[in-house]
Amino acid sequence: MSGGGTETPVACDAAQGGKKRDSLGTPGAAHLIIKDLGEIHSRLLDHRPVTQGEIRYFVKEFEEKRGLRELRVLKNLENTIQETNECLLPKCRETMECGLGETLQRLQAANDSICRLQQREQERKKVINDYLTASEKRRLVQWEEFVSGQPQRRAEVDEEHRRAVERLREQYAAMEKDLAKFSTF
């Protein structure tokens, strides 16, 4: 690999038919060497195409497997929904209609009895309130009569007291006279 001029033919070149090879020093040969080195480098050291191919293969396989798995999940969901719509939903609806009618009847009966109880309670409260109001009015009338009759009663009691005092005076006066008769003995 000298950078010099021409090469002398080697014995093996002459033996091959006398065809002369390009020398390593010519510009075309350097270009071929660089091209060969680039191919060797890309094959040995540049793994981008291989990596990209592997990535594409992995993504394709992943999407296929994932797609199948999701398809199975969706199919199972569809079967479950169809089974629910065909079997469970009519049974639930029928059970609900049977039980709901009976429940509504019970609820209506309970509601009616509660309304009756509430009405009785309101009537009882009204009777009690009316009685209390009437009693209060009677007591007020009685109180008014009592208060208005007090001066007359007081006058009667005072008169009675005056008479009793007068009688007691007369009695004590009579007793003093009797005592005076006995004390002179």
Curated annotation (Swiss-Prot):
Tissue-by-tissue expression: Detected in heart, brain, spleen, lung, kidney and testis.
Residue ranges of the region described as Disordered: 1-25
Keyword Acetylation among UniProt keywords: yes
Gene Ontology biological process terms in this record: anterograde axonal transport; anterograde synaptic vesicle transport; developmental pigmentation; endosome to melanosome transport; melanosome organization; melanosome transport; neuron projection development; otolith morphogenesis
N-acetylserine PTM sites in chain numbering: S2
Keyword entries, A-Z: Acetylation
GO CC terms, sorted: axon cytoplasm; BLOC-1 complex; microvesicle; transport vesicle
Cited InterPro entries: Bloc1s5 (IPR017243)
Disease: Defects in Muted are the cause of the Muted (mu) mutant, which is characterized by light eyes at birth, hypopigmentation of the coat, platelet storage pool deficiency and lysosomal hyposecretion.
Protein family per UniProt: Belongs to the BLOC1S5 family.
Known function: Component of the BLOC-1 complex, a complex that is required for normal biogenesis of lysosome-related organelles (LRO), such as platelet dense granules and melanosomes. In concert with the AP-3 complex, the BLOC-1 complex is required to target membrane protein cargos into vesicles assembled at cell bodies for delivery into neurites and nerve terminals. The BLOC-1 complex, in association with SNARE proteins, is also proposed to be involved in neurite extension. Plays a role in intracellular vesicle trafficking.
Quaternary organization: Octamer composed of one copy each BLOC1S1, BLOC1S2, BLOC1S3, BLOC1S4, BLOC1S5, BLOC1S6, DTNBP1/BLOC1S7 and SNAPIN/BLOC1S8. Component of the biogenesis of lysosome-related organelles complex 1 (BLOC-1) composed of BLOC1S1, BLOC1S2, BLOC1S3, BLOC1S4, BLOC1S5, BLOC1S6, DTNBP1/BLOC1S7 and SNAPIN/BLOC1S8. The BLOC-1 complex associates with the AP-3 protein complex and membrane protein cargos. Interacts with BLOC1S4, BLOC1S6, DTNBP1/BLOC1S7 and PI4K2A.
Protein name stated in the entry: Biogenesis of lysosome-related organelles complex 1 subunit 5
Native source organism of the sequence: Mus musculus
